[in-house]
Amino acid sequence: MKPVKILWHKLTPNATIPTKRAEDAGFDIYTTESDVLLQPHEKHLFKTGLAYWIDKEHWLMGVDRGSTGSRGLHIHCGICDQGYRGEIFICICNDNDFPVHFSSSAADRKSVV
């Protein structure tokens, strides 16, 4: 199996290129937003400031990280098709009965190729 080629493009200066260690299942994708308060059972589309290009016959799928569920948060799974060239968003839902504050651009989404 040949390696998948993926190119990241910053749409905003404060965007962070996703990171991936060799042993990771996918990329950690970071938001460009901070100081967001999610009320109980509220969801928010977090901006990433990123677009991407990927080899044909591949796509990105956003899924929960292992630690996300333990904090009462849920990433609404989404697929970014190979031909999509717009900004990637992270939809996070607060499943808790209390507000959750996002103070920095944490890596809250795992993206699997």
Range-by-range predicted roles:
Residues M1-V113:
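DUTPase catalytic domain/fold
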